[in-house]
């Protein structure tokens, strides 16, 4: 059946309130869109990242009368009688199938492929990681993830111990293991990320070589030959002494989650522990690499 879509122009302060009210009114789906093509920088931990100008998009069943909902919204002091909104009917689709069709196998570097489970593997002789979009961040499509995957592919990880700091979906940890790492330790602040990393490691038959920890549970004496941290500039700076401590002398480091304009500052800061290389860039994002002094 077709659906009714209600789009409301608002701001980041009120978007969550509107979302909650629309769910109470019977919306079957709520999404947030960028109202003015403005990049999100660093949301605080635990917060939903929202743009200053946000569009709340609510989906309702086709037979829903939205008149009472619109009248209710008009009573909200931060919206008022003439709030900006649009109602339209959208065609019925197999939304799951359409979503799946958007994901294809992607190659990173010379050896590594990330493949959704429902797609045929393009090169069975390559290093193939089976990973579906789902829990936690990281499917290879974001530039920072791609930069890290390309870096891992460029290394000889045979018999190396690796730390994935901020492991998210586990994509980097699993890729490192498939590329020959002896052991990988994944660390993340989110239980959901730990679960997602474990599930993806099991799917790729490398779970026996992956250790996963919340930050407070990581071993005090943990060290690795290679450390990759795809997080954000703020945490990278705050955690720099700990990250440096985790890398063995002569070990390799990759940092991402950085915008281009943030890269030089972070590189300079890490240079007290590492010999830093020139930054690599993809779109508006950067990756820093270095060798432990």
Curated annotation (Swiss-Prot):
An example of a Pfam family matching this protein is PrmA
Q: Where does S-adenosyl-L-methionine bind?
A: 145, 166, 188, 230
| Endpoints of the signal sequence | none
| Reaction catalysed by this enzyme | L-lysyl-[protein] + 3 S-adenosyl-L-methionine = N(6),N(6),N(6)-trimethyl-L-lysyl-[protein] + 3 S-adenosyl-L-homocysteine + 3 H(+)
Q: Which molecular function GO terms apply here?
A: protein-lysine N-methyltransferase activity
GO process annotations (BP): methylation
The entry's cellular-component GO terms read: cytosol
Q: Which UniProt keywords apply?
A: Cytoplasm, Methyltransferase, S-adenosyl-L-methionine, Transferase
Q: Where in the cell is it found?
A: Cytoplasm
Chief location of this protein within or outside the cell: cytoplasm
The answer, when asked if Zinc is one of the entry's keywords, is: no
Biological role stated in the UniProt entry? Methylates ribosomal protein L11.
Q: Which NCBIfam families would you find in this protein's record?
A: prmA
From the Swiss-Prot or TrEMBL record, give the protein name: Ribosomal protein L11 methyltransferase
Question: From what organism does this protein derive?
Answer: Shewanella sp. (strain W3-18-1)
Source organism lineage? Bacteria, Pseudomonadati, Pseudomonadota, Gammaproteobacteria, Alteromonadales
